[in-house]
Amino acid sequence: MYFKESTGFPKDFLWGSASAAYQVEGAWAEDGKKPSVWDKFVRIPGKTFKATTGDKAVDHYHMYKEDVRLMGEMGLKTYRFSIAWSRIYPDGNGQVNEAGLKFYEDLIDELIKNNIKPIITLYHWDLPQALEDQYHGWEDRRIVDDFVNYATTLFKRYGDRVKHWIILNEQNVFTGHGWMLAKHPPGKFKDMKTYYQVNHHAFMAHAKSVLALKELYPDALVGSSFAYGPAYAVSDKPEDQMACVDYEDLKSYYWMDVYAYGRYPRSAMKYLESLGVAPHFEEGDAEILKEAASKVDFMGVNYYKTCSIE
């Protein structure tokens, strides 16, 4: 076994913290913002603990200057925050909301003033409710163009000051909890075929947004983040080892391979095809996924736990 003495973290390592718009901002219906799917979902009895909502949260929308000052005192070098799509485009598309753009612009400037690098997450699960009402959100291919339009608006507005971008936060979580477990909007249970099609639409939104950013700002750093849980076989028995391989193909590499290589794991796709739940591709999708994968700069990994497979 080889041991090497640690030299510590690099001096330019970005120690920081992160948040999600719905979890911290509050101001859920102020300055032109319209409801997101979470604003509606939390009002369904039994969906949240003691019917709690993010209507006020920690009031970051009004307290951001104080929050940033405290971040500076903590010594944070970076702050990753998400943007509420329905604060920028209240209806998900159509008319842009200048008040929403101004809020995030002021937040970015305040961070920079305090020597904190802003990292923007474009999507942390708060789809505009208007798009859910118009065409069922991520279930419809139209979501791709609406998302890229939203993303491009942000790139053009903030790209001169923001270098680091995350397109989607934990795609595997918001799709799994939304279409398989009914824990998140839209609250569907074991809708497997829709689940895989929703993921394909999300991959296309990710890929086209990556390409849009690189066209505007070639030196920007971009990727998506993924909730990765390493899997370990419970024994060295061949059947347990193969079960672990299959699990990782369907629960991890199904996302990571698309981000990194621009293609789905072959064995996973064969399995989904045998079940009749493989996603539908439009002409050119495979090429777009491949091109975007060649231009991503990183993959964010959110690590919670491991799992044992048999």
Per-region residue spans from a language model:
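A generic structural signal for short
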Residues: 55-56, 95-96, 198
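Active-site mouth loops of central-metabolism enzymes
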Residues: 49-63, 139-141
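Internal amphipathic alpha-helical repeat/solenoid segments
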Residues: 60-67, 90, 100
